[in-house]
Amino acid sequence: MPLTRRKHFLGCAAALTATAVSLTGAMDAQSASAAGTAGVAGHAAGAAPRPRPADDPDPVADAIADATDAANAAGAGDFDGPGPGDIGDDIGRALEDERAEAADTREKPGAGEERTGAGQLSAARATTGDPRAAGATVYKGRAFDTCHAPSLTTLRAWRSSPYRAVGVYYGGRGRACPNQPYLGPRWMRGARAMGWRVLPVYVGSQSRCVGSAHKKHVPIGARPWTQGKAEGRDAVRRAKAMAMAPRSALYLDMEAYNFRKKGCARTTLAFIRGWSRTVRAHGYLPGFYSSADSGVRHMETARRAGVKDLPAVMWFARWHMGPSVNKERSLAGGAWKPHRRIHQYAGDVTETHGGRRMRIDRNAVDAPVAVIK
């Protein structure tokens, strides 16, 4: 790194460290005040002040956003694979640990809900490690996704294609094609019987700074963490109804957004973390689909800062280039590996196989798929 650039980064790091110290002191003072006041918060009038809820301003996300701003100001916005030790790494880890001690935001299943497989997925909670060790089923090869799940007759015809996996949009209020006349448990089992693997996609609420005009009607609300958890539960319920068992990967679709807007980045990250934590707590693997230069780069920035509860699999869209899960410049070389990446390398193309024509996106896959029961 050039000397002038290094000085700029060191200056940013010093400023962020001071911010972290200030935030930690404030959180300690708040905890001391709550501990010294009689009564339990929320149970009687005059009770102690309640702890900061998960949807209040998040010091972890603030530190990440500040680190991103500093990197962009230094001209580091177009990195080709950031290395260790960048701004915000130690600060993000410290603040995350502090926050975890200050408030337990663990997902707690309600009556009738399951934790099936949650313990079994401990090996797959990080962004590295082979997910098969936790019981996931990994597919490596070509896949297509299309807005409407095709009929089983069309799937049978497409066995002559180079694809052996199909992405389907099975849930979420942001789906462009909410009506799926073929998609259901019978379809899932029929696809499996023909040798197809399934990549289930959940299109929930979208970032407030989403670029697509067609997604602005389903924005993340004022309580992103809580909303993310609620939609995570919905994703799990719908997966079970579609005959997808625990250890299945479920992919959250977050269309391209401007993560350099600090407030928007903070809100979007809180939603994604809430969704991912909840899906993971129920024994499923949380995956994430987005543009390589927006959502995927945002997740990489968060990973470098030591943030927890990130998605376990990364599905990045970068069109007009050859298929490769290993050469994405928005991800560090060792991040989300092994068997944790999907590259969508072409979109809105038309292909015909076995006399059946479909408009699809093309993907190269080395990642977990649905476990169909």
Named regions from a protein language model:
Residues 1-35:
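Secretory targeting and sorting signals
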Residues 220-231, 269-280, 305-327:
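Acidic, His- and aromatic-enriched active-site or binding-groove loops in soluble protein domains
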Residues 135-161, 168-260, 264-269:
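Substrate-binding cleft of extracellular glycoside hydrolase catalytic domains
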Residues 22-67, 84, 116, 123:
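C-terminal region of N-terminal signal peptides and the immediate post-cleavage residues
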Residues 279-298:
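Aromatic-lined carbohydrate-recognition surfaces of secreted/lumenal glycan-active proteins
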Residues 297-305:
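Distinct, well-ordered alpha-helical segments
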Residues 58, 81-104, 110, 117-146, ...:
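Functionally critical loop-and-helix segments that line ligand-binding/catalytic clefts
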Residues 164-166, 285:
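Short acidic/polar active-site loop segments enriched in Thr and Asp
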